[in-house]
């Protein structure tokens, strides 16, 4: 693991000591090299001892999320260049440093062997993310968004810390490989139910569960492009990863406790999709669509079957790349018309035909057509939910229908129609932007050819 963590940390001195006109090029190329050299980790043989140490370990659950995190760093740097073009060199280097610190804490979260280390790194990601939102956001409301993000996350996480301390005192270890052998069968008591709730609530806030999601649209809308990308692609997946780890350990309790959360997720999935139909703000629409997709992941994790675990991990990876691509496209529109309102960006297809092609591809992937990994993830989750109850066909079918509707609404509103007068003299699409979209689309394409490497522990 150190061969990934140490080069990433060394990006910080590279950013500060490189010449001013080469700061973006050097950091992007170096981080892209780290991404490419880390891809070999996706090959997980049956013997995991090569990826094991007292502090860090990788298995087929954490590796795909870790690779997604590493892959996203150069993409964030490519996307941020225009946003910081008018800033001073010190601002640019500070921004890059903040992103790298966030990256290191995310890598250590996904690779943590100990639950306390996982908790510490999980909380550490909060600080750089909040700095990115409150320091480099576009509007004044970014301070309000930062406050929401901070307090929702902290209020969900503090009970988890107390519970972890309690488990440490009782069992003597929080090592993820030791815990399955130390935990005794848990009775369905009021106290153990509370223990399950405190363990999962921190991750449900992060997912977010419908009802605890109010911080997400605010944070997405006010964050700069790198903040939106890392929020959508990685930070929401931290919740899913934590829930997968914890619910497997507290196994018998999950089958007693899952019912209200399943109902809330099924309801929230349809509601957040419906909210998307009424949005005028591009980034807000994509943020609410993330809530809808993550509700599917919560349903999959709660059902606790091998198929649902495969579906949850596949959908998390697929959604990470898709939503990040959509945020990049929304940002490219914002950089040209300086407004997030969709109706003001209408008719851009005639002015930016290549960008319209990327919009079409991203919209299609968001609707989960075959042969994309989005479809594989959704199919696995939907079939598992049918095996739990046949009545889930109604909310699931409705969600698929509404997802298609709001995606087409977003596509047609921004690309079709008569071009507005203020959009006549906009800049053309740059090679940098097309490269960025291609680097989002290429992994989705390649993974659809061989999805088994991201199907997780139960494949």
Swiss-Prot record:
Core subunit of the mitochondrial membrane respiratory chain NADH dehydrogenase (Complex I) which catalyzes electron transfer from NADH through the respiratory chain, using ubiquinone as an electron acceptor. Essential for the catalytic activity and assembly of complex I. Its main location: mitochondrion. Core subunit of respiratory chain NADH dehydrogenase (Complex I) which is composed of 45 different subunits. PANTHER family: NADH-UBIQUINONE OXIDOREDUCTASE CHAIN 4 (PTHR43507:SF20). It is a multi-pass membrane protein. It is found in: Mitochondrion inner membrane. Belongs to the complex I subunit 4 family. It catalyses: a ubiquinone + NADH + 5 H(+)(in) = a ubiquinol + NAD(+) + 4 H(+)(out). This is NADH-ubiquinone oxidoreductase chain 4.
């Amino acid at each position: 693991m150190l061969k990934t963590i140490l080069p990433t940390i060394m990006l910080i001195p590279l950013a500060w000591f490189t010449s001013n006109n080469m700061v973006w090029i050097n950091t992007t190329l170096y981080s892209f090299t780290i991404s490419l050299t880390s891809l070999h980790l996706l090959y997980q043989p049956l013997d995991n001892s090569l990826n094991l140490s007292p502090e860090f370990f990788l298995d087929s659950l954490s590796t795909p999320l870790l690779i997604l995190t590493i892959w996203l760093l150069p993409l964030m740097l490519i996307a941020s260049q225009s946003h910081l073009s008018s800033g001073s060199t010190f601002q640019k280097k500070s921004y890059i440093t903040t992103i790298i610190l966030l990256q290191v804490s995310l890598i250590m979260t996904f690779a943590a062997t100990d639950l306390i280390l996982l908790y510490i790194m999980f909380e550490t990601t909060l600080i750089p993310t909040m700095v990115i939102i409150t320091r480099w956001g576009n509007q004044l409301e970014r301070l309000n968004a930062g406050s929401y993000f901070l307090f929702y996350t902290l209020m969900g996480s503090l009970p988890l810390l107390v519970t972890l301390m309690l488990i440490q005192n009782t069992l003597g270890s929080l090592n993820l490989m030791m815990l399955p052998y130390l935990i005794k069968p848990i009775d369905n008591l009021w106290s153990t139910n509370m223990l399950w709730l405190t363990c999962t609530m921190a991750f449900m806030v992060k997912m977010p569960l419908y009802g605890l999601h109010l911080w997400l649209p605010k944070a997405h809308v006010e964050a700069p492009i790198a903040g939106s990308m890392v929020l959508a692609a990685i930070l929401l997946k931290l919740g899913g990863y934590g829930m997968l780890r914890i619910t497997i350990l507290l196994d018998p309790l999950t089958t007693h406790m899952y019912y209200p959360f399943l109902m809330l997720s099924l309801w929230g999935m349809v509601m957040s999709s419906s909210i998307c139909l009424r949005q005028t703000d591009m980034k807000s629409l994509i943020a609410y669509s993330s809530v809808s997709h993550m509700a599917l992941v919560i349903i999959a994790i709660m059902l606790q079957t091998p198929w649902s675990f495969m579906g949850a991990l596949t959908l998390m990876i697929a959604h990470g790349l898709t939503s990040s691509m959509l945020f990049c496209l929304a940002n490219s529109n914002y950089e040209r018309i300086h407004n997030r309102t969709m109706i003001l960006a209408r008719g851009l297809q005639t002015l930016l035909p290549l960008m319209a092609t990327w919009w079409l591809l991203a919209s299609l992937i968001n609707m989960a057509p075959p042969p994309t990994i989005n479809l594989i993830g959704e199919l696995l989750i939907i079939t598992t939910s049918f095996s739990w109850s046949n009545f889930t066909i109604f909310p699931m079918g409705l969600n698929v229908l509404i997802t298609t509707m709001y995606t087409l609404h977003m596509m047609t509103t921004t690309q079709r129609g008569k071009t507005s007068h203020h959009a006549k003299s906009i800049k053309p699409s740059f090679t940098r932007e097309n490269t960025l979209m291609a680097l989002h689309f290429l992994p989705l394409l390649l993974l659809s050819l061989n999805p088994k490497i991201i199907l997780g522990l139960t494949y």
